[in-house]
């Protein structure tokens, strides 16, 4: 069913038992709760084109000193969404393999999909601040922020700027230009166990693994002079 409600996205505070006390409200310091996101679309920009599916996975917390990655990436949210316009690009459909005609019939209404996603994010984050992470951030953020503002009854759970670009983090830690910070340039120690499949949820999990690997990466040597 396209509007799939998984066991992982049912109920309030589904990940609270896996979060540090700071996230559950037992600590007054600000805490980030990270959510890796991936979208599959039928074109390059929201509005004229549509989100066809999106996936979210809880990706860890950070209190300014300690990063805690999940033991398992099993706190997830996935929806397939009804297109909002008649425009699409065949190349985009070839990449993600989604049946746009089926989604016109069976896809979830974007208003309910985005409102449910916002509720799930806020429930998992608890008292922490939800932060969207992606590699690169620009594409997924542009789509999800537009869709949350346009369709969610609660607006954006990430406000207008609570976001983290994994590509920039890698470039800074590796002391390389952004142009050289593609996923293909990741050293073996930072690569994920999951494969990139162009399924939104699977790619969000893959991305969450990369995010945690880079966040915890202590670079000892590098060929460049800072």
Task: Explain the meaning of each model-derived region.
Residues 1-4:
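Methionine residue identity
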Residues 12-138:
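Conserved non-catalytic scaffold segment of RNase H-like nuclease domains
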Residues 38-40, 140, 165, 203:
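Acidic active-site catalytic centers that drive phospho-/nucleotidyl reactions
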Residues 44-46, 171, 209:
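Conserved protein kinase catalytic core
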Residues 78-96, 100-103, 164-205:
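Active-site-proximal helix-loop-helix substrate-binding element of RNase H-like nuclease domains
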Residues 131-138, 142-143, 182-226:
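Acidic, Mg2+-coordinating catalytic module of metal-dependent nucleases/exonucleases
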Residues 138-161:
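Substrate-recognition/cap helix-loop segment adjacent to the acidic, metal-dependent catalytic center
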